[in-house]
Amino acid sequence: MPPALVDIPVDGPAAEVYRTSPEEGWRVIRTKWRVTGVVPGLIEGGGRASGYFTSATGITIYRGDAWPEENLGDAFIADCGSNLVHRKKIRRSGVELIAERPADEQKVEFLTSTDLWFRPVQFANAPDGCLYLCDMYREVIEHPWSLPENIKKLLDLNSGNDRGRIYRIAPAGFKQPGRPQLAHATTAQLVATLESKNGWHRETAARLLWERQDQAAAPSLKKLLKESKSPLARLHALHALEGQGMLREAELLTALSDTDAAVREQAVRLAEKFITNGAFPPALWTKLRELAGDPDIAVRYQLAFTLGEVRGGERLTSLAAIARQDAGSAWMRAALLSSLAEGAGELFTVLSGDPVFRATEAGQEFLRQLAALVGAKNSATEVNVVLAYLGQLNEPALAFSMTSALGEGLQRARVSLAQSGGAVAGILERAVKAADDGALPEAARVPAVRLLAHQPYAEAGKRLIALLDQSQPQAVQLAALGTLAKFNDASVGADLLPQWNSLTPRLRAEAVPVLLARPERATELLRAIGAGTIRASVLDSTQVKLLTSYRDATVRELAAKVLAASPASARQPIIDGYAPALSLKGDVAHGKKIYEERCISCHRSSGEGFALGPDFVTVKTTGKEKLLTNLVDPNHEVRPEFVAYVVETKDDESYVGLVVNETSASVTVRQAYGKENVIPRANIAKMRSQGQSVMPEGLEQNLTPQDMADLLEFISTAQP
């Protein structure tokens, strides 16, 4: 499923801002102290004191009528720390929204003040059509906790607590309109006000109509819905009728045929109230099915959700029509899947039989998701239908990947794919041959290797270990390692560790989390370290902490014994040893090579790499001294979003990494090389912070001061 939280600004959450007020002296000093490590605290904006969002607040959409119409729908965001108001234009991209600076405000803000006490914190759309701004007006706006004591004692944190202002932001030549008297308006006047271009007037009239519940409003509301030239008025009329229990099928049919997509979208949502025993009235159902081909994706998106309230096979035709048009949208796929409490197998049959749909990347992804849903529902009839199709599909890579998806769904239902019978045996036999066939392209072998996870380990284990050989393509090796990780057989660790010396650095980096995931594997790894066959340096600091605090007592005790022999040394002497690098001229080209060897698995730079830690472009202005400290001692100062967490599951697995997304149903843990593990909350036994950076210590090992100078130069010149 797509993430519940989506950042829509194209310039990111810490976007550039352009203040006209001078930087406060204390802010400059605090930033310098943080950068040099004198005081703890977040280092934002690459070590700059200002010039980026630090205190965004009061997000408000302009809905008035005093300003030019081009400003309708603009978002206004205050940054009280920078004494300014920022503006964003919002547009749709599919079902998502994108926010970007107006063309005429690329390097300036909508409103700024040179007054350091100007602290905009909130806005309101007012009855006069203007935007009102609340200025808290304080000398210091920062939370006391964010100020070092040596600075705090020089400031009066209460200065201005008897002040504050409200501004009206009005266009040139603005004339104050008459004061509205909506509280005393008649019902007919309130209905007429729904056509106002002023959002405050419309919304107030709508609220009063709902509060009065005057049934006499029905005729005028119905007329407004049919005849108004304002889409917003028609939208208000539609909801006013529904809110007063006066929305009938005739009015809904009118709204479903509206020329404005937003009205049609809302009408589809309200149509759900007309469902009886899983069915719409015939005329309404006919119209809704037509909307599967609506030219606006927002209407189709809402329809995809609404169809989930309907029972019966007829809805599948509409779901299939939407899928054919919109399967490329992850949001639309999620909407379609949410509507398949029943019928996933039937929809799979319809779409898999469409060669045009099946040939597209989006179509294949949706078919995989459908197969997984069929498995999770665990209907024997549907599972057999899918398997029968996959058994005769003459596209091996697609057949293997969809069978894997089916198997993963079955696992969620606590059922084994191998026990499903039917065509499974034949598909697995084909996968075994394809996995071993070096003549096949990687695109066919990788899904075949992954499918081996659904064989018993006694059959698949040796083959997967053999596929770790250096003669195999890296993609096949990684697929084999990832497949090994899915087995809970006690032999996995013992089988994997003898291959250690032949594993590439990339495979070793991915193999360590596999070995740490289960107690019996972690035990084997610790024994190998204790015996000297594997060096303790393969473990970073977060992994050492995981082992020494492991929930299994045997692992904890063994870790304390084995790892105590090589305690982490203090980092400051190492930092001091690299001090000459700060005065050496750096070679960017060589620095890039070091980045590719040591940093690319967790950091992005110039469009390359994986986003576990911060993008180098966001830290390049920190200064080389601070960069050196953070490279050698990553736990010197850790931003909260980069603190490592351990998630332990009820299946006795452990994951260590960054928690990058949380929903009511799952937690997503990101690890090196962009690997993400989505863990259902129902399967989480325990989740805890490690209290330190996800970045390991020791990455500087074997680097000379000149190497460090080259790496620092590369980071300092990073591009987006």
Predicted feature residues:
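Protein kinase-like catalytic domain
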Residues: 170, 603, 715-719
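Gly/Ser/Thr/Pro-enriched helix-cap/hinge segments flanking short amphipathic alpha-helices
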Residues: 196, 203, 207, 631, ...
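Long, ordered, helix-rich scaffold segments
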Residues: 134, 156-162, 169-594, 619, ...
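C-terminal capping alpha-helices of c-type cytochrome domains
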Residues: 237, 551-569, 577, 624, ...
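C-type cytochrome heme c attachment motif
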Residues: 58, 130, 165, 220, ...
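Beta-propeller domains with acidic blade repeats across secreted/periplasmic ectodomains
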Residues: 1-189, 200-201, 210, 280, ...
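Sequence context surrounding c-type heme c attachment/ligation sites in exported
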Residues: 143, 560, 568, 585-600, ...
